[in-house]
Regions:
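Membrane-interface alpha helices of multi-pass inner-membrane proteins
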Residues: 141, 188-204, 215-216, 235-241, ...
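Transmembrane-helix motifs of polytopic, lipid-linked glycan transferases
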Residues: 108-132, 169-173, 382-388
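Membrane-interface anchor segments at the N-terminal boundary of transmembrane helices
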Residues: 104-108, 323-405
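Membrane-interface transmembrane helices that cradle and orient dolichyl/undecaprenyl
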Residues: 132-134, 170-192, 200, 218-224
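Membrane-proximal stem/loop segments at transmembrane-domain junctions that anchor or position
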Residues: 251-351
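Membrane-proximal lumenal/periplasmic loop motifs of glycosylation machinery
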Residues: 47-62, 72-95, 99, 107
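Loop-to-helix entry region of an early transmembrane alpha helix in multi-pass inner-membrane enzymes
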Residues: 83-84, 88-95, 100-119, 153, ...
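Multi-pass, polyprenyl lipid-linked donor-dependent membrane glycosyltransferases
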Residues: 109-116, 142-174, 200-210, 425-430
Length: 459
């Protein structure tokens, strides 16, 4: 009778790449079906109707479409106010995707977002499976691909899905480069990642911090301090071309030298003596009398908010705590806080359906609902940090992968502390947070024993 070790050798190796591809394509096909069955409707801009077809409206959907409409009407240098109040990057992406005509633009957008998300999830899982984290790769893949909020966001109008895919793609390429250690390919990976981080910043400027720190971490470890620092500088300069183009657009359009003029307003909502850190309560902000152009007023308001935080450390810490809770809060229930009312998942969520009756609403928003919500919030954070700690305790590559994920997660979280607490801001880093939670969950189910495999990968 064959021994256990011999039977293991005779057992065919599982083709994870094929399995990942099968599921990624299956989900993509299902999304295509959903996209082409979404009922068309009209919204109105400046007294004229605008057709919305093949997409759901995200939290700021109307504003993005208003910017897109301005670009269609007046071109890239449109003076439409929303294009300089908010970053014009996402409406410009929409304009680029309107090559089949404006009528098909939204359908093209959601197909593009869905395809990118499936590919990013697939590539991330494939690269993970080449490391000692192979046994975690399938669970992480399933948790990311089938998370209803994250996966359905690719069918909604909003930057969140593309930026979440961006973090997965850049992480996958970094892992691929570290494994291959091929200097000839490094320049290609550097260029691709720089463009991806640039496009992410193009749509949401605050993500540049995570991009810069991730790039430095990767290249310093890959090439050492001197060469790594030089390559990092080159990569960052490439990434900055994209937000710089928004400054150029705004200057040509309305004479404003800024990416957007809403930062101060957003920060002011989350600060002040009567602020809660979120969108609830009074929005009186901090004492400030800005003067000058809209861009100058925005800069002055940012300074006022920062000065208030420095002058009120106790109140600031309380607001930072509140914003952290809001950032990690559930999508629905008594603890939720943010702008995810249009989350597609909420239209079919059984918890939401329970609230249609008085008894169900009392259950969800009562004591039991609060306990469940807090367990969901704290449990998710516990799994995330446990997953990160599990990777930190491993050898170089696994620790490095954990650091790459945590850099993206922590920078996005910390930046929200000086702006406003909103669980929607969690979406861009949700793929990586689900990865760490998958590591934490599987390790926990194994009684705390990491599920590492031996491989000839980097040591």
């Amino acid at each position: 009778m064959a021994s256990k070790s011999k039977r293991a050798l005779l057992k065919p190796k599982e083709n994870l790449s094929r399995k990942f591809l099968y599921w990624a394509l299956s989900v993509l096909i299902i999304k295509f079906f959903i996209i082409f069955t979404i009922a068309a409707g009209f919204i109105e801009f400046s007294g004229k109707p605008f057709l919305v077809d093949g997409a759901w409206l995200g939290a700021d959907g109307e504003n993005y479409l208003k910017g897109f409409d301005g670009l269609l009407t007046d071109g890239v240098f449109s003076t439409e106010g929303i294009l300089n109040y908010w970053p014009a990057g996402y409406p410009l992406v929409l304009l680029f995707l309107s090559f089949f005509g404006s009528t098909w633009a939204l359908t093209t957008l959601t197909i593009f977002q869905s395809a990118i998300f499936s590919f990013a999830t697939y590539l991330f899982a494939v690269e993970l499976s080449k490391t000692r984290l192979k046994k975690y790769s399938y669970l992480a893949f399933i948790m990311i691909l089938f998370n209803p909020t994250l996966t359905l966001s690719s069918i909604a109008i909003g930057y969140e899905s593309l930026t979440a895919s961006g973090f997965l793609l850049t992480s996958a390429l970094i892992i691929k480069d570290i494994l291959e250690k091929n200097d000839k390919k490094l320049n290609s990976y550097l260029l691709i990642n720089s463009i991806i981080f640039g496009l992410m910043t193009f749509m949401q400027p605050r993500l540049i911090v995570g991009g810069i720190l991730t790039t430095f971490t990767w290249l310093l470890i890959r090439k050492g301090i001197k060469v790594g620092a030089l390559l990092s500088l080159i990569a960052i300069l490439i990434s900055l071309i994209f937000p710089a183009s928004l400054i150029y657009r705004n200057n040509k359009a309305v004479g404003v030298n800024s990416i957007s003029t809403n930062l101060g307003v957003t920060m002011n909502i989350g600060a002040g003596d009567e602020a809660t850190g979120g969108y609830t309560g009074e929005w009186k902000g901090v004492p400030c009398s800005p003067m000058g152009t809209q861009a100058e007023k925005d800069s002055q308001l940012v300074k006022c908010v920062i000065d208030w935080y420095l002058s009120n450390p106790t109140k600031s810490l309380k607001l930072f705590y509140n914003k952290s809770i809001y950032f990690w809060s559930p999508w629905f229930g008594p603890v939720k806080s943010g702008t995810m009312e249009r989350n597609p998942w909420l239209t079919i969520s059984p918890v939401v359906k329970m609230t249609s009756t008085q008894e169900g609403a009392e259950f969800v928003y009562g004591g039991v609902g609060k306990i469940v919500s807090w367990l969901w919030l704290l449990g998710g954070l516990a799994l995330l940090f446990y997953g990160y700690l599990t990777l930190w305790r491993q050898k170089f590559l696994e620790r490095f992968i954990g650091n790459v994920a945590m850099i993206a997660i922590s920078t996005n979280w910390l930046i929200s502390l000086i702006s406003i607490g909103d669980h929607r801001f969690r979406l861009p880093i949700m793929g990586l947070s689900l990865f760490l939670q998958a590591v934490g969950l599987k390790t926990l189910l194994r009684g705390g024993k990491p599920a590492m495999v031996e491989t000839s990968a980097l040591r």
